[in-house]
Amino acid sequence: MLEKVKNIIVVLSGKGGVGKSTVSTQLSLALRKNGFKVGLLDIDLCGPSVPYLLGLEGRDIFQCDEGWVPVYTDESQTLAVMSIGFLLKNREDPVIWRGPKKTMMIRQFLTDVRWDELDYLIIDTPPGTSDEHITVMECLKEVGCHGAIIVTTPQEVALDDVRKEITFCKKTGINILGIVENMSGFVCPHCTSCTNIFSSNGGASLANYAQVPHLGTLPIDPRVGVLAGSTTSVLDELPDSTTAEVLTHIVEKLKTIFVS
C-alpha cells in the first residue's frame, strides 16, 4: 500500500559487498534527522542486513486488517522498516527459494505493508539486475519510482557492473539521481587522514561518462562501522566526517528535486 508515500527511491548496486545497505540505512537516518518521515524496505531476500545494521534483529512484525505493520525504530514512528529478516527465526537461516516465490514475497512487501504517510520510501535492493528488480519495477508502475541511487566501489570490476545497472535503469525508465562511490580510500581512526588503498574517482568518471550526477565519494571509515547495530545517524555521531558531508549533500539534492 504505497498510496500514502510521496517519493520512492531505489538503491542499486552492480555487485554485492559495496556498502549499498549501509548507504541505504544511513540515508534513511539522515532524511529522518532532516524532519522527514521515512520508510526503509529491504528486499534483498537472500542477504537481508538492514535489521542488523539498525539493531532491530529479533523484532516481530504483525498483521492488521490493512496488512503487515512495519517495525518502527522510535516512538514517534518517523522511521518504519520492513525486511524478510524479521520473518527468519535465526540470522543464519538461508532463504532457499526459487524465483516465483521471491517474486510473490516482494509483491507482498510492496502491496501488503501498511505504510503510513511517508515523505520517502527507500528500497534497498539485492545486487545485480535480477527477477527481484524486475518485480519491483512492475509493482511500482502505477505509483511510480521517483529515482535510483547507484552505489559502487572504485575498482574496475565493480564499475563494469554499474554500467549494466545504468543500462537497466534506462531501459526500465528509472531516473538516475546519481552515483555514490563507496570505499574510496581509508580514513585512519587516529589522525583521520585518508589513504587510497584502491583506485579512486572511478565513480566520478563513470558518472561523467553516463551523464548522470556524481553524488559523492565515501571512504572506508572505521568510525562509521562502529555505528552498525544502532539507529545512530552519522550526522549526529560524526558531523564533521566525509560520510556526513556526502549524506548531507544527497539529502539537500533530494529536497531540491522532490516536493515533500
From Swiss-Prot:
Transmembrane segments: none annotated. It holds the Pfam family ParA. It is found in: Cytoplasm. ATP binds at residues 14-21. [4Fe-4S] cluster binds at residues 188, 191. The keyword Nucleotide-binding applies. Gene3D superfamilies: P-loop containing nucleotide triphosphate hydrolases. GO terms for molecular function: 4 iron, 4 sulfur cluster binding; ATP binding; ATP-dependent FeS chaperone activity; metal ion binding. One of its GO terms (biological process) is iron-sulfur cluster assembly. Binds 4 [4Fe-4S] clusters per heterotetramer. Contains two stable clusters in the N-termini of Nubp1 and two labile, bridging clusters between subunits of the Nubp1-Nubp2 heterotetramer. Its cofactor is [4Fe-4S] cluster. One of its GO terms (cellular component) is cytosol. Keywords: 4Fe-4S, ATP-binding, Cytoplasm, Iron, Iron-sulfur, Metal-binding, Nucleotide-binding. Component of the cytosolic iron-sulfur (Fe/S) protein assembly (CIA) machinery. Required for maturation of extramitochondrial Fe-S proteins. The Nubp1-Nubp2 heterotetramer forms a Fe-S scaffold complex, mediating the de novo assembly of an Fe-S cluster and its transfer to target apoproteins. HAMAP family: Mrp_NBP35, NUBP2. Heterotetramer of 2 Nubp1 and 2 Nubp2 chains. Belongs to the Mrp/NBP35 ATP-binding proteins family. NUBP2/CFD1 subfamily. This is Cytosolic Fe-S cluster assembly factor Nubp2 homolog 1.
